[in-house]
UniProtKB/Swiss-Prot annotation:
Listed name of the protein: Probable manganese-dependent inorganic pyrophosphatase
InterPro entries recorded: DDH_dom, DHH_sf, DHHA2, DHHA2_dom_sf, Mn-dep_inorganic_PyrPase, Oligoribo/pAp-PDE_c-di-AMP_PDE
Manner of cofactor binding, per the entry note: Binds 2 manganese ions per subunit.
Lineage: Bacteria, Bacillati, Bacillota, Bacilli, Lactobacillales
Signal peptide (residue range): none
Residues where Mn(2+) 2 binds: D15, D77, H99, D151
Keywords: Cytoplasm, Hydrolase, Manganese, Metal-binding
Any one GO cellular component localisation term in the record: cytoplasm
Amino acid sequence: MSKFLVFGHRNPDTDAIASSYGWAHLEREVFGRDAEAVVLGTPNEETAFALDYFGVTAPRVVESAKAEGVSQVILTDHNEFQQSIADIKEVEVAAVIDHHRVANFETANPLYMRLEPVGSASSIVYRAFKENGVIPPKEVAGLLLSGLISDTLLLKSPTTHVTDPQVAAELAEIAGVNLEEYGLALLKAGTNLASKSAEELIDIDAKTFGLNGNDVRVAQVNTVDIAEVLERQAEIEAAMTAASVANGYSDFVLMITDIVNSNSEILALGSNMDKVEAAFNFKLENNHAFLAGAVSRKKQVVPQLTDAFNA
């Protein structure tokens, strides 16, 4: 039996790592297949907090599937090829477990594809456990809960699905944690930005989207003080520009999200700033503007950018 690698997107966030870890466990223990969860980048501080809290060793970082001797992979928390492993087009995608839009994706063979408009890929993985009559181990439940908390900002994001609060409650019970207390501690762990270089900061949680022939980089950082992040605007802009030149991004959009007040400041650079302004009906001043109530890249930024770039 061939081995499957299971992984989330590049620049992995907590949900990317948690969902792949949980699905790999399901593959091994329920479906009887050889599967290993790996990651496409070093876990961020929020994810490191969750891994440490539940006593889980961080999965291996890999850069190539073929170099690992596998021919089949399973994707969680993403489907767009430019967000995946470098040689994604050279291996077979056996399954996708995701909660995002489908774009820039095609396969030569049929596959198992499970897409649901829920708050996290971890929510889908937990649902699969329940459907198979299996209670996930405490550490798996803890990671899946962490993925859901992270992606929905403790169920406050507009991406939160009506079923997510119940999922969170059940996972918290299995994991043996208080949902609110653990959730706040997890999110707080992800707001420590002072120790990061500008290059690290813009790469904590970043994805590239193909928008009408443009490669648009959309990154997000969580904070409790937007002004503190903007004090570093010059060096952050320099890092954004350098990344755009090195990788061919037409535009770089950074969401600086206040997780306490549920707002974001948008810092943007590139050749299509008119489209960025049209997307959010605001005017950039000194390359940034306030976006009230925006906390979700998936629901409140990417669809609006997509419409504006296609207009």
